[in-house]
């Protein structure tokens, strides 16, 4: 937000006469109360080697020069001198008699641009008629600055008139400080920072009226809690906003348009309450606040026809939607050149609905920015009074003695009880007596002092102001006191480090797994902890799939990502897609992180105290209410697993590569992971294996489903794995394998099995039948041709036999091989091939 220093000073000076600060002190004051200053922009006076380089002029004559490629005007301007000043100008938004701002020869504009007399377009131009951009007040180059009639006489020093000795402060208002999106809020923060009195400008200035300004109905589905309206009639459609108002708008980055629009923008900047002005003559019937009808259309003020969503909230009359609630008005009721009757509206909208509507329509507005951050629900009528009074003063209208103010009952904020010395204990600072109560009163809280009946300690009973819904518990109040007293007062004490105990077994296992995946060519990425909206619908999961049971965050950073992840794959796939969209093709990404799995015992709990150790019962209740949070490991493989080069064309990643990563995880964790065929989305049902440890399914691996990949924007044949690391048995120590000094006997065996039998099942059967002499087994050939037989395949394994205490004979090895084949025949129907 941009705001002029003079505007802030004006509000604070109402109760602190003569108060002034330098721009540097103002910058430091904002930073001291926790606001982020983006830029301090000092306006520059027009200087030069003449007494008055910048003056007010009145246009006396205009001659149109038509012999050039673009329209040019030869103007004679009265600048208070005996003779008219002749000036060439290309702008066309002024007429004879208008007051303009002129830089005379010898003047120097901001940026060091010197004005001189020079011949151009066949005439000598003695000066320049200025736009607000050339003066450094705004960014509008489309026309020159035209002052309101009667503003000043020709020859008046325009440096003083335009206030070019001001400073503009630009601040970055974070989402939790929505009340600072106004001069009212910023001035209050400054008053707190400099410990000054503050008088709130948001006050009612017009008498209460029983009559209704306009019929208004609020439908419950709109979630609008307040809608107020005032009417101003008989305004002059040709009126122009005075310079003081235009100047403040320009310095705030808002372009002046007309008195009705300028006043609503001005009051929004001043008080933080967005307003909208309807041309009352264009409204038909009463106003209804409702959700949009399916397929309903609205042409907004940016001249874009929008197809509305059923979740959009609109203001409608008998003809249909006339405004997109909280974001932008409609073109059909726009205040125009002939408007004489204006209906001013101020409402309180649901921030979440405004946020979603703005994102849905890709429509950003100053009103929407404020509603998304919460607007004070108690200043609607005060803002209407201010706007109506200003509009009547500027445009000569009459404020009708009627007011519509429809409210939906909402619960009042609950008082917060806080020990008086809680800020002292948290900060480790002995603040002067009464500091907490004084600081909380400064930010607008209602503060009472009481005594706790149980402990006998003094307490503050604090009711937060309407514009601070973020104050909900004692910790929030402590933060405010510490912030305003100065964080630099808190002593910097380094806590004593506990004696080192080394890594836990779980931490060692996690590191070992991470190293194993990195050695296998993987790149570790931190998986997002929140699920993308609609990801399980993209996968096609059943409605009762356990992964759909998620934990929602009450106040998420992004409303589209409010659910904690029950699986790491969505985040990893999203990271992979983002890298692929930026040119990466061959990826092996992995992540190790906790997932959140709600259970039937998961339930909300009361906040724990921050000023003392919670009781054992409170800790037990908290731990018992938490969802399960096991550590998962997941990986995604896409593109080539082996790069192409002079040695060959390379090799595409396939399910076997995902299984190889599973083996790497198993080896690092010191467990044996078996693989069994499975059908589990988002994996391909024919190329997916469930991962089993000691009879328990701990994860899945294989190639992802083609439909899921297409909907996710990922290449075909992308593979993935995910398994529950905490479900693996924790091996404190591993048995050291016995290394036999005797030679091994190598034999190959080919068996024929049904195509439906998994190779892993055959391997398991061979391993069990081979007994202790079978040291290793590896599949090295798969044949599914005609000679294998219909519906069958041939698998060839390399078997390695070795005895720890003797040299095996060929007969002993053959007997062990035959036993392995017999076990496979019993288990999976394998037939030995010759």
UniProtKB/Swiss-Prot annotation:
CC cofactor: Mg(2+)
UniProt record, GO biological process: phenylalanyl-tRNA aminoacylation
Ranges where the FDX-ACB domain occurs: 740-833
Location of the tRNA-binding domain: 48-159
Chief place of localization: cytoplasm
Reaction catalysis annotation: tRNA(Phe) + L-phenylalanine + ATP = L-phenylalanyl-tRNA(Phe) + AMP + diphosphate + H(+)
Family annotation (PROSITE patterns): B5 (PS51483), FDX_ACB (PS51447), TRBD (PS50886)
Record-level Gene Ontology MF annotations: ATP binding; magnesium ion binding; phenylalanine-tRNA ligase activity; tRNA binding
NCBIfam families: pheT_bact
Subunit annotation: Tetramer of two alpha and two beta subunits.
PANTHER family for this protein: PHENYLALANINE--TRNA LIGASE BETA SUBUNIT (PTHR10947:SF0), PHENYLALANYL-TRNA SYNTHETASE BETA CHAIN AND LEUCINE-RICH REPEAT-CONTAINING PROTEIN 47 (PTHR10947)
Family as reported in the entry's similarity comment: Belongs to the phenylalanyl-tRNA synthetase beta subunit family. Type 1 subfamily.
Name the record gives this protein: Phenylalanine--tRNA ligase beta subunit
Organism in which the protein naturally occurs: Nocardia farcinica (strain IFM 10152)
Gene, per the UniProt record: pheT
């Amino acid at each position: 937000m941009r705001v002029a220093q003079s505007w802030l000073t004006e509000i604070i000076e109402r109760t602190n006469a003569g108060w002034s600060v330098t721009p540097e002190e103002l910058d430091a004051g904002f930073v001291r109360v926790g606001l982020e200053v983006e830029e301090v922009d000092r306006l520059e006076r027009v200087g030069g080697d003449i007494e008055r380089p910048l003056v007010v002029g009145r246009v006396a004559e205009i001659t149109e020069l038509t012999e050039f490629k673009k329209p040019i005007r030869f103007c004679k301007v009265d600048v208070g001198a005996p003779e008219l000043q002749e000036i060439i100008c290309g702008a066309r938004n002024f007429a004879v008699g208008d007051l303009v701002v002129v830089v005379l020869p010898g003047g120097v504009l901001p940026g060091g641009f010197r004005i001189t007399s020079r011949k151009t377009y066949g005439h000598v131009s003695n000066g320049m008629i200025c736009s607000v951009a050339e003066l450094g007040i705004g960014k509008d180059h489309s026309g020159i600055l035209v002052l309101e009639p009667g503003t000043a006489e020709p020859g008046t020093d325009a440096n003083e008139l335009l206030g070019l000795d001001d400073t503009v402060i630009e601040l970055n208002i974070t989402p939790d400080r929505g009340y600072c999106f106004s001069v009212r809020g910023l001035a209050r923060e400054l008053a707190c920072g400099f410990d000054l009195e503050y008088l709130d400008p948001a006050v009612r200035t017009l008498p209460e009226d029983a009559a209704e300004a306009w019929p208004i109905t609020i439908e419950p589905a709109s979630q609008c809690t307040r809608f107020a309206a005032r009417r101003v009639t008989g305004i002059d459609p040709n009126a122009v906003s005075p310079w003081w108002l235009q100047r403040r708008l320009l310095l705030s980055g808002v372009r002046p348009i007309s008195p009705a629009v300028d006043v609503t923008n001005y009051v929004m900047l001043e008080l933080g309450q967005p307003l909208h002005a309807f041309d009352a003559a264009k409204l038909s019937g009463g106003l209804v606040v409702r959700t949009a009808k399916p397929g309903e259309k609205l042409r907004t003020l940016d001249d874009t026809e929008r197809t509305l969503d059923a979740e959009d909230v609109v203001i409608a009359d008998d003809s249909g939607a006339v405004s997109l609630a909280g974001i932008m008005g409609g073109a059909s009721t726009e205040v125009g050149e002939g408007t004489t009757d204006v209906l001013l509206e101020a409402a309180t909208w649901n921030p979440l609905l405004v946020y979603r509507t703005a994102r849905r329509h890709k429509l950003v507005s100053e009103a929407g920015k404020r509603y998304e951050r919460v607007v004070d629900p108690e200043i609607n009528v005060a803002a209407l009074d201010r706007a109506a009074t200003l509009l009547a003063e500027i445009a000569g209208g009459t404020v009708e003695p009627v007011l519509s103010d429809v409210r939906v009952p909402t619960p009042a904020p609950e008082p917060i009880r806080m020990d008086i010395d809680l800020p002292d204990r948290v900060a480790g600072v002995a603040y002067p007596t009464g500091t907490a109560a004084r600081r909380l009163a400064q930010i607008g809280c209602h503060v009472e002092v009481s005594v706790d009946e149980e402990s006998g300690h003094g307490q503050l009973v604090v009711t937060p102001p309407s514009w601070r819904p973020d104050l909900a518990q004692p910790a929030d109040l402590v933060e405010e006191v510490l912030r305003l007293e100065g964080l630099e007062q808190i002593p910097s004490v380094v806590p004593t480090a506990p004696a080192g105990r080394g890594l836990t077994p779980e931490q060692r296992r996690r590191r070992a797994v991470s190293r194993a995946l990195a050695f296998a060519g993987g790149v570790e990425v931190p998986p997002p902890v929140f699920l993308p909206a609609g990801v399980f619908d993209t996968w096609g999961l059943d409605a009762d799939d356990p992964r759909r049971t998620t934990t929602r965050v009450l106040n998420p950073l992004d409303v589209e990502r409010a659910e904690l992840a029950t699986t790491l794959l969505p985040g990893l796939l999203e990271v992979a897609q983002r890298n692929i969209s930026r040119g990466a093709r061959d990826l092996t990404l992995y992540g190790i992180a906790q997932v959140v799995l709600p259970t039937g015992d998961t339930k909300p709990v009361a906040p724990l105290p921050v000023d003392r150790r919670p009781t054992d019962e409170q800790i037990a209740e908290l731990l018992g209410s938490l969802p399960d949070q096991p550590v998962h490991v997941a990986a995604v493989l896409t593109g080539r697993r082996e790069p192409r080069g002079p040695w060959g064309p390379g090799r595409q990643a396939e399910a076997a590569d995902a299984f190889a990563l599973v083996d790497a995880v198993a080896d690092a964790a010191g467990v044996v992971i078996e693989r069994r065929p499975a059908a589990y989305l988002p994996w391909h049902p024919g190329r997916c294996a469930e991962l089993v440890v000691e009879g328990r399914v701990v994860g899945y691996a294989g190639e992802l489903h083609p439909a899921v990949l297409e909907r996710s924007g990922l290449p075909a044949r992308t593979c993935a794995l995910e398994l529950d690391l905490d479900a693996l048995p924790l091996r404190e120590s591993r048995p050291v394998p016995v290394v036999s000094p005797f030679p091994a006997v190598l034999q190959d065996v080919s068996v024929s099995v049904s195509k439906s039998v998994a190779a892993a099942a055959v391997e398991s059967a061979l391993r069990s039948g081979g007994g202790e002499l079978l040291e290793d087994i590896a599949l090295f050939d798969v044949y599914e041709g005609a000679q294998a037989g219909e519906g069958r395949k041939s698998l060839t394994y390399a078997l390695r036999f070795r005895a720890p205490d003797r040299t095996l004979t060929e007969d002993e090895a053959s007997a062990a091989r035959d036993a392995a084949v017999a076990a496979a025949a019993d288990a999976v129907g394998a037939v030995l091939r010759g």
